[in-house]
């Protein structure tokens, strides 16, 4: 064989081999676990108690290398059989695919008269829940807004925390975030350590203001309901590149919608869409 032809043939074979290896690797990469149509079971692998009725529940994925596959800002449906009836509820994981490989986490507050939430409190390690998704009309993208105002009540902090964590972890995302977070008591404030860390490490980008219904004497935050004045003082004014996100108990959400219109925001639609100036989870 002519030396030149040999070199060409060897190079061609090597190139084909490399391409074959790359294609095989790509085909074997773990795909996101979530399925919009199919319910799948995931076992409880850890439980971190935050308050007397709230905990972070960690569920394992089939393989330690897999991710849930949840777009930031969306949620999942959880199904449980309660008294012979299959009941579905929506929850936003507090974990991101980027920091939760092999598992996902849910922040759940259990109520005595709740259905699914009470079911969570009774789970033991190894017990399974049924999940499908993703669901929702919100899909956060870096720098999609210049500023985001957030209002959360109770466990309504979950989608806000997920988005804030994504922004915090991405140095190229310059979105500014102002959060007003209401609770009944100081003990009820969830993920406070994590929220305060965002502010401490990136004070020019993150601002958090806490309100309590029942504040202790030494409390330095806000007291009472989230009023028009509170929103005007603590959140960005309505403008191009500004979006307001809301998640919490229905009475709070209704009040916030009215207050927002008073401040000049567009009226919230019955079903929120991605580009709305006010998006209600």
From Swiss-Prot:
Entry's transmembrane regions: 2-22
Q: Which residues form the FAD-binding FR-type domain?
A: 37-141
Query: Does the entry feature the keyword Mitochondrion, yes or no?
Result: yes
Q: What is its main location?
A: mitochondrion
Q: Which InterPro entries match?
A: CBR-like, Cbr1-like_FAD-bd_dom, FAD-bd_FR_type, Flavoprot_Pyr_Nucl_cyt_Rdtase, FNR_nucleotide-bd, OxRdtase_FAD/NAD-bd, Riboflavin_synthase-like_b-brl
* Cofactor(s) the protein requires to work: FAD
Catalysed reaction per UniProt? 2 Fe(III)-[cytochrome b5] + NADH = 2 Fe(II)-[cytochrome b5] + NAD(+) + H(+); 2 Fe(3+)-[Dph3] + NADH = 2 Fe(2+)-[Dph3] + NAD(+) + H(+)
Identify the PANTHER family for this entry. Answer: NADH-CYTOCHROME B5 REDUCTASE (PTHR19370), NADH-CYTOCHROME B5 REDUCTASE-LIKE (PTHR19370:SF184)
Similarity comment: Belongs to the flavoprotein pyridine nucleotide cytochrome reductase family.
Q: What is this protein called?
A: NADH-cytochrome b5 reductase 1
Report the source organism.
Kluyveromyces lactis (strain ATCC 8585 / CBS 2359 / DSM 70799 / NBRC 1267 / NRRL Y-1140 / WM37) (Yeast)
Gene encoding this chain? CBR1
